[in-house]
Amino acid sequence: IYVMDEANVETCGADAELSNNELWLFAQMERVAGMVKRDKNHPSIIFWSLGNESGVGANNAARASWVKDYDPTRLVHFEAYMHNGGSRQYGYGIDFMKTNRPAVNPPEPPAVDVVSTMYPSVEGIIKLATQEGETRPVLMCEYAHAKGNALGNHQEYWNAVKKYPRLIGGYIWDWVDQSVIRKDSVTGKEYFSSLNGTNGLVFADRKIKPAINECK
């Protein structure tokens, strides 16, 4: 199995406020460096991720630089660099698939080795894969949200992946339902309790769902 090891750095909802604040640099660097030092000898890890949904800022560039210096053998990934590097906003309000500007920002820092995006349309990943002047691989770091009766158009994504060489696939959100075992107060029967967490390819007890057959 190929693994992208991702640091425990996320500021979802705060945009890039922490990534542009030098007071948070040490804490963010500590998490990234700790991950790389801990896992560097695992052969299944083929690239590092600086974190998830934490905006663009100087702290990210510093962390990417450290990782590349410490381990030049692996790629560095960070999805937030898809967004405007000159803006403190994370960029979810901009539907770049419906604009005339390049899918990847021209001023994007050369800190990352992978073009990455979340929940794109099929047309969106084709646009990324065919952008003139761009040669890096394209990854869907989150896609095909497997909630309920999902993955209905999964084949369309993989038709594109197989057609365009720069598309390298993606990570489905997510693998297993997020649940805890509870007992019914009346019958005493155990059941899996989940509040809006039934978004796995398999149930909490690892029994398969139809969605995983679609993946196969």
Regions found by a protein language model. Name each.
Residues 1-216:
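Extended substrate-binding grooves/exosites of carbohydrate-active enzymes
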